[in-house]
């Protein structure tokens, strides 16, 4: 017989043996599984009444024990018998009672419970009005900068300021804005102010002035006016008027200032909510710090911005509308 045929026959026989062995093993495992399942069910059914009886016995023993504790001395023998017959259960009840006693917490009437107080965050209130400039610079946030709109800060900075504007004698005249023309009423008691105005009108003055007046039968609200001045970088300072410094530091040189054209020419910040004025005056003393032409351009832009925000009109020293030609004339005076 050929060798290949022999090998094929042996392989088929081995395969049949493996298949038969697998079928036999599977049947044996199934039979064991069903047998265990039947045994488990049978044992459970047998055990169930035993457990119920045990639980009933335990409950009955516990009730008997409690009843025996309440009996008189005449029943001591029966109590001792019940105690001896149910000693494990009594031991369990005693342990439960000890644990219950340990869990009891006694609190005296006058004692207060101990609470764990959580530390609460309380923001620190810093009185910036009572701080000096050096302390402000150390405590201020570099990203935030100095809040120049704070009234207390402005008052303190104004007290420290050593700068002077004009001749410390400048007061601004009142004005009446009529339908046909704009006229200014000069205060009679301020002779020094009259001299400054006359010199300004004659062209012999060392001041350059611009006026921003309200429309007819209207006025500038104090809150709106101060808000606009703060946004433009003005700082309330000496003589109770606003000044535009080189920077936000009040110790820096003054470029130009803003005053009230109504007597006495100051701004009452304490009653700023009730403050109204018909106009303001922007003035710059010559020569000014730095580039005079650049400073004058800055003052002109500030006047136009104030007039735009407050719905006012920019007027020259000669009480004329400030137009492009007037602006060129102003710039020619300092060039």
Curated annotation (Swiss-Prot):
Coiled coil: none
Cytoplasmic side: 26-335
Any one GO BP annotation for this protein: division septum assembly
UniProt entry keywords in alphabetical sequence: Cell cycle, Cell division, Cell inner membrane, Cell membrane, Membrane, Transmembrane, Transmembrane helix
Membrane topology recorded in Swiss-Prot or TrEMBL: Single-pass type I membrane protein
Pfam families xrefs: ZipA_C
Parts of the chain that traverse the membrane: 5-25
Subcellular locations according to the entry: Cell inner membrane
Key word Glycoprotein present: no
Entry-linked Gene3D superfamilies: ZipA, C-terminal FtsZ-binding domain (3.30.1400.10)
GO cellular component, one term: plasma membrane
Residue intervals annotated with topology Periplasmic: 1-4
Subunit description: Interacts with FtsZ via their C-terminal domains.
Recorded family membership: Belongs to the ZipA family.
Function description: Essential cell division protein that stabilizes the FtsZ protofilaments by cross-linking them and that serves as a cytoplasmic membrane anchor for the Z ring. Also required for the recruitment to the septal ring of downstream cell division proteins.
Record protein name field: Cell division protein ZipA
């Amino acid at each position: 017989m050929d060798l290949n045929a022999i090998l094929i026959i042996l392989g088929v026989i081995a395969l049949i043996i493996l298949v038969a062995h697998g079928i036999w093993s599977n049947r044996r495992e199934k039979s064991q599984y069903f047998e265990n399942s039947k045994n488990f069910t049978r044992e459970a059914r047998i055990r169930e009444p035993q457990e119920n009886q045990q639980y009933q016995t335990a409950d009955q023993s516990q009730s008997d024990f409690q009843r025996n504790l309440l009996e008189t001395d005449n029943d001591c023998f029966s109590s001792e018998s019940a105690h001896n017959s149910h000693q494990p259960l009594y031991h369990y009840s005693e342990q439960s009672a000890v644990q219950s006693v340990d869990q009891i917490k006694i609190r005296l009437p006058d004692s207060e419970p101990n609470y764990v107080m959580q530390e609460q965050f309380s923001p620190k209130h810093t009185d910036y009005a009572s701080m000096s400039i050096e302390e402000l610079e150390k405590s201020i946030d570099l990203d935030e900068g100095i809040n120049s709109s704070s009234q207390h800060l402005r008052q303190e900075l104004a007290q420290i300021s050593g700068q002077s504007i004009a001749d410390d004698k400048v007061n601004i005249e009142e004005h009446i804005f009529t339908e046909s023309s704009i006229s200014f009423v000069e205060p009679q008691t301020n002779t020094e102010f009259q001299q400054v105005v006359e010199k300004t009108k004659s062209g012999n003055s060392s001041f350059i002035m611009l006026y921003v007046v309200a429309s007819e039968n209207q006025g500038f609200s104090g809150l709106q006016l101060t808000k606009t001045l703060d946004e433009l970088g003005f700082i309330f300072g000496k003589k109770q008027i606003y000044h535009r410094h080189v920077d936000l530091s009040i110790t820096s040189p003054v470029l130009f200032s803003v005053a009230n054209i109504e007597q006495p020419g100051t701004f009452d910040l304490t009653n700023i909510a009730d403050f109204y004025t018909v106009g303001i005056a922007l003035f710059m003393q010559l020569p000014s710090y730095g580039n005079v032409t650049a400073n004058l351009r800055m003052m002109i832009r500030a006047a136009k911005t104030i007039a735009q925000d407050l719905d006012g009109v920019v007027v020259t020293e000669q009480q004329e509308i400030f137009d492009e030609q007037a602006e060129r004339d102003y710039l020619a005076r300092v060039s």
